[in-house]
């Protein structure tokens, strides 16, 4: 059964109104009907330029005094204000107004209020007036509070308000009220990681998921201690001098706007519209991005390790996190930090590459390259050179492949290999591979009992020998087919390297 209390609690969310905007259809200056435009300008009490009595336009109608055309931007702001719906986005400030009223004819004592915000993972206290409780709460008396908190967790959030008071009979009573609201993600973030040797490229795509427009003030990547990051997005490739000139122009335009005055005529219309339109210019910063509803923007970050040879930077899964700051069209600031962005490491035990390839290679003259082998595991590896002969064409191995020593954990060895070019032109160094052998096992001499030695050895018949031979041939064929379809896990092939092979003699003799 619901209990009637002497106090009444009301909670209202404080939010700014929403100004509906109209997206205009922009067109070229030459396509504008000047007579129709001049009529519409008079009806809206704003003129873009001087129009003579015949309806024709002069040269200053859409062109400023300095000869530069004036850009027409359709703001489309209407004069009606509509209250914003109960939508709140992650990173915004949640603000609410709480009113506690005594609607009974009795006086209550020791009134205090506790407010907390509950999420799926935490409870955040917002208000606790127990230490400053109201001694007497007369009939008709009310007490108002304003609480605010940055929303840092999406999903269902619950505002819990607990009221405690003492009745005239001395009985202590309390009641609670719960207010649920949904926190939505303002941005849809999609990331893609391109993992290359000694460098990682992070591609981030931001999409505006709100019901209005957003101004992305900044998006920064905060790497972990083992990495450095650099923003290499397209807009950040401008010269510093150009950015400095743009900033100076923006400051100059802002100063001019602050000094402007609106001059009204007898009818209440603006007289100095030409001066206003000449000085009012949309100034944007290279770092600020305007995103309409449903629009997206891509960013690119270059992440490099501070120490290339550091094992922790090579094996580190997390790279860092993104810090995004934006503003709504009312200037309300929002901030969002993502969780740690992780990459997928190449789980291969060994890394093979060819280095120190000569710049000039002569036809039918041997040359040497360096095979670099890196043990990326925590155990000792036993590698062996292998050749994929069906891939080798223009350049082949000149001699026998050397025998490799065991590679210690997290270490690198380099081996010199002699190659021999057979064909001129653009050729590929390909077909060299590494096979990891099983670690050597210490041999154990088997012991046989006397009973086993005394048993006679049965000789197989001719039919059994033929049957075993056929079965072994079938098994060998199946193994060869499986090896052709998919190489074993302990087989690592070097990446192909393109190189140019020149003729040995500078002069070619026609035959």
Curated annotation (Swiss-Prot):
Superkingdom as given in the UniProt entry: Eukaryota
This protein's GO CC annotations: TRAPPIII protein complex
Pfam families associated with the record: TRAPPC13_C (PF23643), TRAPPC13_M (PF23647), TRAPPC13_N (PF06159)
InterPro entries in alphabetical order: TRAPPC13, TRAPPC13_C, TRAPPC13_M, TRAPPC13_N
Family per record: Belongs to the TRAPPC13 family.
PANTHER family hit by this protein: TRAFFICKING PROTEIN PARTICLE COMPLEX SUBUNIT 13 (PTHR13134:SF3)
Full protein name: Trafficking protein particle complex subunit 13 homolog
Species this chain originates from: Dictyostelium discoideum (Social amoeba)
Lineage, top ranks: Eukaryota, Amoebozoa, Evosea, Eumycetozoa, Dictyostelia
């Amino acid at each position: 059964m619901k209990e009637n209390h002497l106090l009444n609690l009301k909670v209202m969310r404080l939010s700014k109104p929403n100004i509906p905007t109209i997206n205009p259809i922009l067109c070229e200056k030459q396509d504008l009907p000047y007579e129709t435009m001049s009529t519409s300008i008079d009806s809206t009490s704003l003129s873009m330029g001087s129009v003579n009595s015949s309806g024709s336009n002069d040269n200053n109608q859409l062109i400023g005094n300095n000869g530069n055309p004036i850009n027409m931007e359709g703001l489309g702001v209407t004069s009606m204000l509509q209250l914003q719906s109960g939508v709140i986005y992650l990173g915004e400030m949640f603000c609410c107004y709480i009113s506690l009223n005594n609607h009974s004819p009795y006086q209550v004592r020791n009134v205090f209020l506790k407010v907390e915000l509950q999420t799926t993972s935490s409870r955040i206290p917002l208000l606790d007036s127990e230490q400053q409780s109201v001694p007497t709460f007369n009939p008709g008396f009310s007490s108002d509070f304003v609480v605010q908190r940055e929303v840092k967790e999406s999903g269902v959030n619950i505002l819990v308000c607990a009221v405690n008071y003492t009745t005239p009979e001395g009985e202590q009573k309390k009641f609670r009220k719960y207010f649920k609201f949904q926190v939505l993600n303002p941005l849809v973030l999609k990331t893609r990681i391109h993992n290359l040797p000694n460098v990682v490229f992070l591609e981030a795509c931001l999409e505006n998921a709100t019901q209005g427009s957003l101004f992305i003030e900044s998006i920064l990547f905060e790497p972990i201690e083992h990495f450095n990051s650099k923003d290499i997005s397209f807009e950040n490739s401008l010269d510093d001098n150009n950015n400095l000139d743009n900033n100076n122009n923006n400051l100059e335009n802002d100063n001019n706007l602050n000094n402007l005055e609106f001059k009204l005529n007898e009818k209440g219309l603006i007289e100095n519209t030409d001066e206003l339109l000449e000085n009012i210019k949309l100034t944007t910063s290279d770092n600020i991005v305007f995103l309409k509803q449903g629009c997206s923007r891509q960013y690119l970050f270059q992440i490099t390790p501070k120490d290339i040879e550091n094992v922790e930077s090579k094996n580190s899964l997390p790279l860092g996190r993104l810090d995004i700051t934006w503003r709504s069209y009312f200037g309300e600031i929002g901030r969002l930090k993502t969780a740690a962005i992780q990459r997928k490491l190449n789980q291969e035990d060994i890394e093979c590459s060819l280095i120190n390839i000569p710049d000039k290679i002569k036809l039918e003259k041997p040359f040497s390259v360096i095979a670099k082998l890196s043990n990326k595991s925590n155990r000792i590896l036993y590698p062996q050179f292998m050749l994929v002969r069906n891939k080798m064409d223009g350049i082949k191995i000149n001699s026998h492949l050397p025998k490799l020593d065991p590679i210690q954990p997290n270490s690198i060895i380099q081996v010199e290999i002699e190659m021999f070019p057979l064909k001129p032109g653009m050729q590929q160094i390909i077909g060299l591979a590494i096979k990891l052998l099983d670690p050597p096992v210490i041999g154990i001499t088997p012991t046989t009992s006397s009973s086993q030695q005394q048993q006679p050895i049965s000789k197989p018949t001719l039919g059994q020998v033929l049957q075993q031979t056929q079965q072994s041939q079938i098994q060998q064929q199946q193994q060869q087919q499986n090896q052709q379809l998919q190489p074993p896990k302990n087989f690592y092939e070097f990446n192909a390297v393109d190189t140019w092979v020149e003729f040995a003699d500078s002069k070619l003799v026609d035959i």
